[in-house]
Amino acid sequence: MAISQGKSTRLPSGARNVANRGKRKAELGRDPAETRVDEKRLKKIRTRGGNEKLRLATANKMNLTDPATGKSQVVDVLGVIENSANPNYVRRNIITKGAIVETPEGNAKVTSRPGQDGVLNGILI
């Protein structure tokens, strides 16, 4: 069944809200990207207007910036240490924005949205 991002069928009181129209294609949603730690793999998604969005399916390298010096470098991602989005994402090595990942330089916080941007950026913490 399709993922819909339309209005709820329930009112705040719990009463049933009778829709005066059906679902629209513009209200369709998609499954989350759930970027994992592995060899880099991108997914192309067709978006509104025929444009394309790149989703990062898997990644093992990230652009890491040291806030103290302002220098950036590409480093390996060893694993996910903490993810406030979902505790189960740590076990499954899923990277989202705000996740703490382990790198050879130290722990890093992910600042990009890998499922939206198609790139993995982070800052050293």
From Swiss-Prot:
NCBIfam families: eS8 (TIGR00307). Belongs to the eukaryotic ribosomal protein eS8 family. GO terms for molecular function: structural constituent of ribosome. This is Small ribosomal subunit protein eS8. It comes from Methanobrevibacter smithii (strain ATCC 35061 / DSM 861 / OCM 144 / PS). It comes from the Archaea. Part of the 30S ribosomal subunit. The keyword Ribosomal protein applies. PROSITE patterns: RIBOSOMAL_S8E (PS01193). Residues 1-38 are annotated as: Disordered. GO terms for biological process: translation.
